[in-house]
Amino acid sequence: MGRLSWASPIQRFRFFSYLSQLNGRRSVLACSGYENRYLSSLVEASDCELDEVPDDRKVAEKDTALHLALSQLSGDFDKDSKLSLQRFYRKRRVSVISTGSLNLDLALGVGGLPKGRMVEVYGKEASGKTTLALHIIKEAQKLGGYCAYLDAENAMDPSLAESIGVNTEELLISRPSSAEKMLNIVDVLTKSGSVDVIVVDSVAALAPQCELDAPVGERYRDTQSRIMTQALRKIHYSVGYSQTLIVFLNQVRSHVKSNMHFPHAEEVTCGGNALPFHAAIRLKMIRTGLIKTANKISGLNVCVQVVKNKLAPGKKKSELGIHFGHGFYVEREVLELACEHGVILREGTSYFIEGEVIEGKDAAEKYLVENKEALDTVVAILRNQLFKM
């Protein structure tokens, strides 16, 4: 190789290349050239610091071209082609509906479930999915909204809904006979813009019309997935122009996979991949234990995992307690959060709630159960502090 000299930024170098034998002799090719070497950091810094001076004429040309393109779009297409961020997002803070649990609202990061989006709640049987859906309906009705419950499982219990606090007289309930009818109802109600919450219970129970008409035993591969894919594209378009919250309840199935001679079971949701894709938020509910009172099972503990969240950081968890026949243990978590944030004062075992001195945690929870006005006041103060609403 040639010897290089680093004495100057521009240097001369020489190298030799031995090629294969030609006509019995070895040919030698000699080349020379120049190479730039900048050894000073000052030269590199000066190159990076030289920014192009803004040209007002180019900026004006770009602005004129943009206005011409927008004028062409408005003339050639309908109003939906209008490019404007404020047209779709008029408020910086998204409108939400509470889940009925402050702990879960905190895990979601925005204070609840967003309007104008689709949400998937999935888990195994008896994990609290229906209870969560009824609490969402209850919170929406508090705000004066209309709600619809589409019961594909034929398992809606009006007495349970009323015990949780749902006004069943103002609740729209439907039991469509097929998946196509169910999803068409969702699309029509969403386009109307008059319904605040739509609950579909559940995706796993949606039966395509072809399966209902065929005898038992015939297989229709991926029919439900294809129907969900087509329908959710329409619903996703409709929900973008409304303030409707659509909650899909779903179940999980065990799918056995083989990995290099080691088969293992993997949990998958029903209905294919369309719903996980279109859903802005996905919640997974897991039973973690039972609640016993006087040696009797009175409820269960569940863990809600935020698997997907397009509005805030995801992968958070929330521990909830469900009282059979009454819904969430709201008073317990409100008392804990209120003491933590100074809304309710606690000294030892004494609690100071609205001028009342109450001894013991159980007595304080009972006081909140019996005094709904005090509970609502504490919840309002907490939501104002936690979410700055």
UniProtKB/Swiss-Prot annotation:
Q: Which CDD domains match?
A: RecA
What are the record's GO terms for cellular component?
A: mitochondrion
- Family annotation (InterPro entries): DNA_recomb/repair_RecA (IPR013765), P-loop_NTPase (IPR027417), RecA-like_N (IPR049428), RecA_ATP-bd (IPR020588), RecA_C_sf (IPR023400), RecA_monomer-monomer_interface (IPR020587)
Fill in the transit peptide range.
1-15
In which domain of life is the source organism classified?
A: Eukaryota
GO BP terms in the entry: DNA recombination; DNA repair; mitochondrial genome maintenance; response to heat
Chief location:
mitochondrion
* Pfam families per UniProt: RecA (PF00154)
For this UniProt record, the keywords arranged alphabetically read as follows: ATP-binding, DNA damage, DNA recombination, DNA-binding, Mitochondrion, Nucleotide-binding, Transit peptide
Q: So where does ATP get bound?
A: 123-130
Per its UniProt record, what SUPFAM superfamilies does this chain match? P-loop containing nucleoside triphosphate hydrolases, RecA protein, C-terminal domain
Subcellular localization: Mitochondrion
PROSITE patterns per the UniProt record, alphabetical:
RECA_2 (PS50162), RECA_3 (PS50163)
A Gene Ontology molecular function term of the record? single-stranded DNA binding
- What is the protein's known function? Involved in recombination ability and DNA strand transfer activity.
Query: PANTHER family from the xrefs?
Result: DNA REPAIR PROTEIN RECA HOMOLOG 2, MITOCHONDRIAL, RECA
The family this protein is said to belong to: Belongs to the RecA family.
Name of the protein this chain belongs to: DNA repair protein recA homolog 2, mitochondrial
Its lineage opens with: Eukaryota, Viridiplantae, Streptophyta, Embryophyta, Tracheophyta
